[in-house]
């Protein structure tokens, strides 16, 4: 399972495929937050550089903490950044290079995101009258 497949599936399941790819192309704002208890909230964003950020978030002392965040170049879906706030880790990969360790981690994380049910279409919960 690749992160590209996971992102595209989640975005499609939320009816946001066209908006997502337009944001990638034009570097416009795109934000999708997916709650799937008991797991941490998953956020997919498009950065001002046109990169795709995938992150799990939790709160610590009122601050949003990334656990982790991996930023991908959608041209080839190689990771360009890795952040793990709780450990104070930030890595930026130079253009034209890639990190085998981060790529391997991203593949494992993509499989975990799928296994945790983030890629499934959730039925709408009817409003209580």
Identify what each model region corresponds to.
Residues 53-97:
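Amphipathic protein-protein interaction modules
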Residues 1-58:
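Negatively charged, low-complexity tracts enriched in Asp/Glu with abundant Ser/Thr
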């Amino acid at each position: 399972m690749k992160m590209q497949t996971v992102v595209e599936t989640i975005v499609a399941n939320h009816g946001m495929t066209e908006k997502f790819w337009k944001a990638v192309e034009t570097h416009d704002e795109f934000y999708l937050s997916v709650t799937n208890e008991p797991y941490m909230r998953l956020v997919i964003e498009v950065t001002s550089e046109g990169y795709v950020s995938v992150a799990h978030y939790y709160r610590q002392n009122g601050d949003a903490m990334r656990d982790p965040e991996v930023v991908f170049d959608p041209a080839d879906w190689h990771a360009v950044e890795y952040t793990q706030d709780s450990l104070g880790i930030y890595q930026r990969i130079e253009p034209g290079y890639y990190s085998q360790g981060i790529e391997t981690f991203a593949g494992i994380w993509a499989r975990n995101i799928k296994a945790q049910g983030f890629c499934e279409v959730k039925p709408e919960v009817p409003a209580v009258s």
